[in-house]
Amino acid sequence: DIANDPMSAGRQMGGHFTTHSLDKNFNWKNLTEQYNSSSDISPTGAQMPRLLGLAQASKVYRELKSKNSNKFSKNGNEVAWGTIGNASTSEGVFFETINAAGVLQVPMVISIWDDEYGISVHAKHQTTKENISEILKGFQRDSKSNGYEMLKVHGWDYVELINSYQ
């Protein structure tokens, strides 16, 4: 029932918010006129391949000359932004996505929320070096090769967090 559950009409778990891409007549909305949120999913780390796909779509739209693409993209200038907890970075799909995004050089931002605990265990029991930032240093962009720009900030410092996104 769309009236009682406007996010998914009862087809998702609670708290898995999404924006509607179709209007009430099931036609595509102009997605460039709204902020868009892809529904979250429950399996740990499973949002990562989808994040890569959204970023790749933005890159593809930069080269696409379709007359109907203006409802979906502003010339491929979108950035896909996703979040993941430090525990989920132990999942294989996280590293596959990180590597593929670096190879493809897609417009993607990932925020990793690292509280040193994953669901119920300390990072020392699941993360090499107990610090995902240390592991990812090899992906840092430099003058000789592609990679990422990586920033490490205190998530509790709101001003520092905002400045890192700008």
Functional labels for PLM-detected ranges:
Residues 116-119:
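Short gly/pro/ser/thr-enriched loop/turn and capping motifs at secondary-structure boundaries
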